[in-house]
């Protein structure tokens, strides 16, 4: 019996794509590749790290939205599978947020999460 490959999903809202393009343009980045990683740290065990990258590494999961590539490494992908990157503006300003259905808890500051 052949094993079926797992289908990974990571969504990026139109607002987030717009903001990624804006930040890339401000930094003279022509073909933006946004890398999202899950790293150990914070009060709850894991936290997100995001930044522009120059390359897509072997094994990376690549999601493309309107010319913006979002790449996630193989370690991080199971932790963010089904999650959504958004850009929200509130009275404190604007920022990226990840809505993650895999997160079973988060700390009070909102910068780290746990998975169970």
From Swiss-Prot:
For this record, an example GO cellular component is: cytoplasm
Question: What is a single molecular function from GO for this protein?
Answer: 2 iron, 2 sulfur cluster binding
Q: Which GO terms describe its biological process?
A: iron-sulfur cluster assembly
Q: Which family does it belong to?
A: Belongs to the HesB/IscA family.
Q: Which Pfam families match?
A: Fe-S_biosyn
The protein's superkingdom reads Bacteria
**What InterPro entries does this protein map onto?**
FeS_biogenesis (IPR000361), FeS_cluster_insertion (IPR016092), FeS_cluster_insertion_CS (IPR017870), HesB-like_dom_sf (IPR035903)
Q: Can you say what this protein is called? A: Protein aq_1857
Name its species.
Aquifex aeolicus (strain VF5)
Phylogenetic placement of the source organism: Bacteria, Pseudomonadati, Aquificota, Aquificia, Aquificales
């Amino acid at each position: 019996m052949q094993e079926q490959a797992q289908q990974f999903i990571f969504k990026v809202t139109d607002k987030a794509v717009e903001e990624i393009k804006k930040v890339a343009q401000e930094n003279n980045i022509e073909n933006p590749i946004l890398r999202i990683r899950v790293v150990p740290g914070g009060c709850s065990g894991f936290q997100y790290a995001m930044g522009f990258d120059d390359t897509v590494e072997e094994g990376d999961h690549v999601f493309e939205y309107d010319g913006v590539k979002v790449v996630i490494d193989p370690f991080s992908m199971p932790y963010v599978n089904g999650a959504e990157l958004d850009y929200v503006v509130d009275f404190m300003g604007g920022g990226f947020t990840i809505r993650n259905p895999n997160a079973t808890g988060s700390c009070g500051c909102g910068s780290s999460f746990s998975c169970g």
